[in-house]
Protein backbone atom coordinates (compact mmCIF):
# COMPACT_ATOMS: atom_id res chain seq x y z
CA UNK A 1 0.00 0.00 0.00
CA UNK A 2 2.81 2.44 0.83
CA UNK A 3 4.78 3.74 -2.15
CA UNK A 4 8.27 3.96 -0.68
CA UNK A 5 9.69 5.67 -3.76
CA UNK A 6 7.12 8.41 -3.21
CA UNK A 7 8.02 8.56 0.47
CA UNK A 8 11.71 8.96 -0.35
CA UNK A 9 11.08 11.55 -3.07
CA UNK A 10 8.88 13.74 -0.89
CA UNK A 11 11.14 13.40 2.16
CA UNK A 12 14.19 14.34 0.13
CA UNK A 13 12.45 17.37 -1.33
CA UNK A 14 11.36 18.61 2.08
CA UNK A 15 14.77 17.96 3.67
CA UNK A 16 16.43 20.69 1.59
CA UNK A 17 19.96 19.34 1.86
CA UNK A 18 22.40 22.21 2.53
CA UNK A 19 25.79 22.26 0.78
CA UNK A 20 29.02 21.32 2.52
CA UNK A 21 29.75 19.18 5.54
CA UNK A 22 31.81 20.78 8.30
CA UNK A 23 33.00 17.64 10.09
CA UNK A 24 35.65 15.05 9.37
CA UNK A 25 35.50 11.33 10.17
CA UNK A 26 39.07 11.37 11.41
CA UNK A 27 39.30 10.92 15.16
CA UNK A 28 35.61 10.15 15.62
CA UNK A 29 36.18 6.40 15.96
CA UNK A 30 38.71 6.89 18.74
CA UNK A 31 36.33 9.25 20.52
CA UNK A 32 33.58 6.61 20.40
CA UNK A 33 35.97 4.07 21.90
CA UNK A 34 36.89 6.49 24.66
CA UNK A 35 33.20 7.33 25.23
CA UNK A 36 32.31 3.64 25.52
CA UNK A 37 35.08 3.13 28.06
CA UNK A 38 33.92 6.08 30.16
CA UNK A 39 30.25 5.04 29.96
CA UNK A 40 31.10 1.49 31.00
CA UNK A 41 33.12 2.79 33.92
CA UNK A 42 30.32 5.07 35.07
CA UNK A 43 27.33 2.76 34.55
CA UNK A 44 28.84 -0.71 34.93
CA UNK A 45 26.91 -1.81 31.83
CA UNK A 46 29.07 -4.02 29.60
CA UNK A 47 28.12 -4.24 25.91
CA UNK A 48 27.60 -7.78 24.70
CA UNK A 49 29.06 -7.06 21.26
CA UNK A 50 31.26 -4.45 19.57
CA UNK A 51 29.48 -1.15 19.03
CA UNK A 52 28.84 0.04 15.46
CA UNK A 53 31.29 2.50 13.96
CA UNK A 54 30.04 6.10 13.91
CA UNK A 55 28.78 7.38 10.55
CA UNK A 56 28.63 11.02 9.51
CA UNK A 57 25.57 11.23 7.26
CA UNK A 58 23.61 13.81 5.32
CA UNK A 59 19.89 14.39 5.73
CA UNK A 60 19.41 12.17 2.71
CA UNK A 61 21.46 9.47 4.39
CA UNK A 62 19.34 9.74 7.53
CA UNK A 63 16.17 9.51 5.44
CA UNK A 64 17.38 6.38 3.65
CA UNK A 65 18.37 4.71 6.94
CA UNK A 66 15.00 5.45 8.55
CA UNK A 67 13.02 4.29 5.55
CA UNK A 68 14.81 0.95 5.80
CA UNK A 69 14.06 0.80 9.53
CA UNK A 70 10.41 1.71 9.09
CA UNK A 71 9.60 -0.53 6.12
CA UNK A 72 9.17 -3.78 8.10
CA UNK A 73 7.18 -1.91 10.76
CA UNK A 74 4.75 -0.47 8.24
CA UNK A 75 4.61 -3.79 6.38
CA UNK A 76 3.53 -5.48 9.60
CA UNK A 77 0.86 -2.83 10.00
CA UNK A 78 -0.33 -3.09 6.39
CA UNK A 79 -0.66 -6.84 6.78
CA UNK A 80 -3.30 -6.30 9.44
CA UNK A 81 -5.39 -3.78 7.52
CA UNK A 82 -7.05 -5.26 4.41
CA UNK A 83 -9.58 -7.59 6.02
CA UNK A 84 -11.06 -4.94 8.25
CA UNK A 85 -10.27 -1.63 6.61
CA UNK A 86 -11.42 -1.87 2.98
CA UNK A 87 -14.46 -3.23 1.19
CA UNK A 88 -14.10 -6.04 -1.34
CA UNK A 89 -14.15 -5.44 -5.09
CA UNK A 90 -13.08 -2.50 -7.30
CA UNK A 91 -14.22 0.18 -4.85
CA UNK A 92 -12.20 -1.40 -2.06
CA UNK A 93 -9.13 -1.58 -4.32
CA UNK A 94 -9.59 2.08 -5.25
CA UNK A 95 -9.92 3.09 -1.60
CA UNK A 96 -6.80 1.10 -0.73
CA UNK A 97 -4.81 2.80 -3.51
CA UNK A 98 -5.98 6.25 -2.46
CA UNK A 99 -5.15 5.52 1.16
CA UNK A 100 -1.69 4.35 0.10
CA UNK A 101 -1.02 7.66 -1.66
CA UNK A 102 -2.18 9.64 1.35
CA UNK A 103 -0.19 7.57 3.84
CA UNK A 104 2.91 7.72 1.63
CA UNK A 105 2.62 11.49 1.44
CA UNK A 106 2.20 11.73 5.21
CA UNK A 107 5.24 9.57 5.85
CA UNK A 108 7.32 11.48 3.32
CA UNK A 109 6.37 14.83 4.85
CA UNK A 110 7.05 13.59 8.37
CA UNK A 111 10.41 11.96 7.62
CA UNK A 112 11.49 14.97 5.59
CA UNK A 113 10.63 17.34 8.42
CA UNK A 114 12.40 15.23 11.04
CA UNK A 115 15.48 14.94 8.82
CA UNK A 116 16.01 18.67 9.41
CA UNK A 117 15.95 18.26 13.19
CA UNK A 118 17.60 15.01 14.31
CA UNK A 119 21.20 15.38 15.47
CA UNK A 120 22.11 11.74 16.05
CA UNK A 121 20.55 8.32 16.11
CA UNK A 122 21.39 4.86 17.35
CA UNK A 123 19.44 2.98 14.70
CA UNK A 124 18.05 -0.46 15.54
CA UNK A 125 15.64 -2.72 13.63
CA UNK A 126 12.54 -2.12 15.74
CA UNK A 127 10.92 -5.53 15.26
CA UNK A 128 14.10 -7.63 15.02
CA UNK A 129 16.04 -7.90 18.30
CA UNK A 130 18.96 -9.55 16.48
CA UNK A 131 19.34 -7.17 13.53
CA UNK A 132 22.36 -5.00 12.87
CA UNK A 133 22.66 -1.49 14.29
CA UNK A 134 24.08 1.84 13.12
CA UNK A 135 25.33 4.94 14.89
CA UNK A 136 24.35 7.96 12.78
CA UNK A 137 25.39 11.60 13.24
CA UNK A 138 23.55 14.05 10.97
CA UNK A 139 26.20 16.54 9.86
CA UNK A 140 24.14 19.46 8.48
CA UNK A 141 21.89 19.51 11.54
CA UNK A 142 24.85 19.45 13.92
CA UNK A 143 26.46 22.33 12.02
CA UNK A 144 23.21 24.29 11.92
CA UNK A 145 22.50 23.70 15.61
CA UNK A 146 25.99 24.75 16.65
CA UNK A 147 25.55 27.99 14.71
CA UNK A 148 22.10 28.64 16.20
CA UNK A 149 23.35 27.99 19.73
CA UNK A 150 26.60 29.87 19.08
CA UNK A 151 28.30 26.75 20.41
CA UNK A 152 31.58 24.98 19.73
CA UNK A 153 30.87 22.53 16.89
CA UNK A 154 33.31 19.88 18.07
CA UNK A 155 31.93 19.98 21.62
CA UNK A 156 28.39 19.54 20.27
CA UNK A 157 29.50 16.58 18.16
CA UNK A 158 31.17 14.93 21.17
CA UNK A 159 28.15 15.52 23.39
CA UNK A 160 25.61 14.15 20.91
CA UNK A 161 27.91 11.21 20.23
CA UNK A 162 27.98 10.47 23.96
CA UNK A 163 24.19 10.29 23.95
CA UNK A 164 24.09 7.84 21.04
CA UNK A 165 26.96 5.73 22.40
CA UNK A 166 25.03 5.47 25.68
CA UNK A 167 22.09 4.05 23.71
CA UNK A 168 24.45 1.62 22.01
CA UNK A 169 25.78 0.48 25.38
CA UNK A 170 22.23 0.14 26.77
CA UNK A 171 20.85 -1.96 23.94
CA UNK A 172 23.97 -4.09 23.61
CA UNK A 173 24.51 -4.58 27.34
CA UNK A 174 20.93 -5.16 28.54
CA UNK A 175 19.88 -8.45 26.91
CA UNK A 176 16.13 -8.09 27.52
CA UNK A 177 15.78 -4.49 26.32
CA UNK A 178 15.58 -4.97 22.55
CA UNK A 179 13.21 -7.97 22.78
CA UNK A 180 10.97 -5.98 25.15
CA UNK A 181 10.87 -3.01 22.78
CA UNK A 182 10.02 -5.29 19.85
CA UNK A 183 7.30 -7.04 21.86
CA UNK A 184 5.72 -3.77 22.99
CA UNK A 185 5.81 -2.30 19.50
CA UNK A 186 4.27 -5.46 18.02
CA UNK A 187 1.44 -5.23 20.54
CA UNK A 188 0.95 -1.58 19.63
CA UNK A 189 0.76 -2.38 15.92
CA UNK A 190 -1.75 -5.13 16.61
CA UNK A 191 -3.97 -2.65 18.43
CA UNK A 192 -3.91 0.14 15.82
CA UNK A 193 -6.99 0.93 13.76
CA UNK A 194 -7.12 2.75 10.44
CA UNK A 195 -9.29 5.86 10.61
CA UNK A 196 -10.06 7.96 7.55
CA UNK A 197 -11.67 11.26 8.40
CA UNK A 198 -12.40 11.95 4.72
CA UNK A 199 -11.81 10.05 1.47
CA UNK A 200 -8.16 10.44 0.46
CA UNK A 201 -7.34 11.74 -3.04
CA UNK A 202 -6.04 9.28 -5.62
CA UNK A 203 -3.19 11.57 -6.66
CA UNK A 204 -0.04 13.28 -5.49
CA UNK A 205 -0.70 16.12 -3.05
CA UNK A 206 -0.44 19.57 -4.57
CA UNK A 207 1.75 22.30 -3.09
CA UNK A 208 -0.89 23.58 -0.69
CA UNK A 209 -1.69 20.07 0.58
CA UNK A 210 1.99 19.20 1.00
CA UNK A 211 2.57 22.39 2.97
CA UNK A 212 -0.35 21.43 5.22
CA UNK A 213 1.15 17.96 5.72
CA UNK A 214 4.48 19.44 6.79
CA UNK A 215 2.71 21.75 9.23
CA UNK A 216 0.80 18.76 10.63
CA UNK A 217 4.05 16.82 10.99
CA UNK A 218 5.58 19.75 12.88
CA UNK A 219 2.65 19.81 15.30
CA UNK A 220 2.45 16.01 15.66
CA UNK A 221 -1.04 15.80 14.18
CA UNK A 222 -0.72 13.09 11.52
CA UNK A 223 -3.24 10.74 13.08
CA UNK A 224 -4.27 8.35 10.32
CA UNK A 225 -4.03 5.40 12.68
CA UNK A 226 -5.53 5.40 16.15
CA UNK A 227 -5.38 3.23 19.24
CA UNK A 228 -8.46 2.54 21.32
CA UNK A 229 -8.77 3.54 24.96
CA UNK A 230 -8.67 -0.09 26.09
CA UNK A 231 -5.19 -0.41 24.58
CA UNK A 232 -3.70 2.58 26.37
CA UNK A 233 -1.73 0.32 28.79
CA UNK A 234 0.29 -0.88 25.79
CA UNK A 235 1.18 2.71 24.96
CA UNK A 236 2.01 3.45 28.59
CA UNK A 237 4.43 0.51 28.82
CA UNK A 238 6.19 1.54 25.62
CA UNK A 239 6.38 5.19 26.64
CA UNK A 240 7.66 4.41 30.13
CA UNK A 241 10.36 2.10 28.78
CA UNK A 242 11.52 4.71 26.28
CA UNK A 243 11.42 7.42 28.95
CA UNK A 244 13.91 5.41 31.01
CA UNK A 245 16.06 4.70 27.94
CA UNK A 246 16.15 8.38 26.96
CA UNK A 247 16.39 9.73 30.50
CA UNK A 248 19.29 7.42 31.30
CA UNK A 249 21.11 8.57 28.16
CA UNK A 250 20.48 12.22 29.13
CA UNK A 251 21.82 11.57 32.63
CA UNK A 252 24.92 9.76 31.40
CA UNK A 253 25.73 12.26 28.63
CA UNK A 254 25.85 15.01 31.25
CA UNK A 255 27.84 13.08 33.86
CA UNK A 256 30.39 11.68 31.40
CA UNK A 257 30.25 14.80 29.25
CA UNK A 258 31.51 16.87 32.18
CA UNK A 259 34.81 15.03 31.75
CA UNK A 260 35.25 15.58 28.00
CA UNK A 261 33.02 18.48 26.86
CA UNK A 262 34.30 21.85 28.14
CA UNK A 263 31.18 23.81 27.14
CA UNK A 264 28.68 21.32 28.58
CA UNK A 265 26.64 23.87 30.54
CA UNK A 266 26.09 26.05 27.48
CA UNK A 267 25.15 23.05 25.35
CA UNK A 268 22.68 21.70 27.92
CA UNK A 269 20.91 25.05 28.20
CA UNK A 270 20.75 25.45 24.44
CA UNK A 271 19.63 21.90 23.69
CA UNK A 272 16.88 22.07 26.30
CA UNK A 273 15.52 25.07 24.42
CA UNK A 274 15.78 23.26 21.09
CA UNK A 275 14.55 19.83 22.27
CA UNK A 276 13.36 18.39 18.95
CA UNK A 277 16.27 16.05 18.33
CA UNK A 278 15.14 12.74 19.78
CA UNK A 279 16.92 10.01 17.93
CA UNK A 280 14.61 7.06 17.35
CA UNK A 281 12.34 6.01 14.46
CA UNK A 282 9.63 5.55 17.09
CA UNK A 283 9.20 9.32 16.76
CA UNK A 284 7.77 8.75 13.29
CA UNK A 285 5.29 6.18 14.57
CA UNK A 286 4.30 8.33 17.54
CA UNK A 287 3.50 11.31 15.35
CA UNK A 288 1.67 9.16 12.79
CA UNK A 289 -0.74 7.92 15.45
CA UNK A 290 -0.95 11.11 17.48
CA UNK A 291 1.26 10.05 20.40
CA UNK A 292 4.02 12.63 20.12
CA UNK A 293 5.63 13.02 23.54
CA UNK A 294 7.67 16.18 22.86
CA UNK A 295 9.49 17.13 26.04
CA UNK A 296 7.97 14.55 28.34
CA UNK A 297 10.21 11.60 27.49
CA UNK A 298 13.38 13.57 28.07
CA UNK A 299 12.14 15.59 31.01
CA UNK A 300 10.44 12.83 33.02
CA UNK A 301 13.04 10.20 32.21
CA UNK A 302 15.97 12.44 33.09
CA UNK A 303 14.27 13.64 36.29
CA UNK A 304 13.75 10.01 37.34
CA UNK A 305 17.33 8.97 36.58
CA UNK A 306 18.81 12.09 38.20
CA UNK A 307 16.63 11.54 41.27
CA UNK A 308 17.57 7.90 41.72
CA UNK A 309 21.28 8.62 41.20
CA UNK A 310 21.16 11.52 43.66
CA UNK A 311 19.44 9.39 46.30
CA UNK A 312 21.36 6.15 45.89
CA UNK A 313 24.25 6.83 43.55
CA UNK A 314 24.77 5.42 40.08
CA UNK A 315 24.81 1.92 41.62
CA UNK A 316 21.12 2.32 42.50
CA UNK A 317 20.26 3.55 39.00
CA UNK A 318 22.15 0.63 37.44
CA UNK A 319 19.56 -1.72 38.98
CA UNK A 320 16.89 -0.39 36.62
CA UNK A 321 18.52 -2.65 34.00
CA UNK A 322 18.46 -5.81 36.14
CA UNK A 323 15.17 -7.03 34.68
CA UNK A 324 11.91 -5.83 33.15
CA UNK A 325 10.36 -5.89 36.64
CA UNK A 326 12.80 -3.20 37.74
CA UNK A 327 11.50 -0.68 35.21
CA UNK A 328 9.43 2.04 36.88
CA UNK A 329 5.70 2.34 36.47
CA UNK A 330 4.38 5.64 35.13
CA UNK A 331 3.66 6.70 38.73
CA UNK A 332 7.18 5.76 39.83
CA UNK A 333 8.65 7.60 36.85
CA UNK A 334 7.15 10.78 38.30
CA UNK A 335 8.20 9.85 41.86
CA UNK A 336 11.66 8.22 42.06
CA UNK A 337 11.28 7.70 45.81
CA UNK A 338 8.41 5.27 45.15
CA UNK A 339 10.64 3.26 42.84
CA UNK A 340 13.45 3.31 45.39
CA UNK A 341 11.06 1.99 48.07
CA UNK A 342 9.62 -0.78 45.88
CA UNK A 343 12.96 -2.01 44.60
CA UNK A 344 14.91 -1.75 47.84
CA UNK A 345 14.74 -5.52 48.59
CA UNK A 346 15.99 -6.44 45.11
CA UNK A 347 18.73 -3.80 45.17
CA UNK A 348 20.10 -4.95 48.51
CA UNK A 349 20.27 -8.65 47.72
Question: What are the language-model segments listed below?
Answer:
Residues 128, 135, 141-142, 146, ...:
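Terminal, compositionally biased segments used for targeting/anchoring and flexible tails
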Residues 225-349:
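Pan-zinc metallopeptidase signature
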Residues 31-140:
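Auxiliary, metal-adjacent structural segments of Zn-dependent hydrolase domains
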Residues 25-28, 154, 242, 298:
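Solvent-exposed, acidic/flexible segments
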Residues 108-119, 172-261:
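Post-HExxH zinc-binding segment in Zn-dependent metallohydrolases
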Residues 141-160:
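Short pre-active-site segment immediately N-terminal to the catalytic Zn-binding motif
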Residues 1-74, 78, 311-349:
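N-terminal low-structure segments adjacent to metalloprotease catalytic domains
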Amino acid sequence: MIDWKLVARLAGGIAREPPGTGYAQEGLGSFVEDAESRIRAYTAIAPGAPLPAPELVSRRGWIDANIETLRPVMAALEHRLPARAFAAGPLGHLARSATGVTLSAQLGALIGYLSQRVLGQYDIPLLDPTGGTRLLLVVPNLVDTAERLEANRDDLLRWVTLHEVTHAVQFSGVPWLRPLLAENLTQLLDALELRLHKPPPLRMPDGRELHALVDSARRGELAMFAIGRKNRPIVERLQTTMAVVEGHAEHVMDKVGAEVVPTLAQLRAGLDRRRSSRSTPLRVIERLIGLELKLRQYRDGKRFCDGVAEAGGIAALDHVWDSQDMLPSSAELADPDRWMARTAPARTR
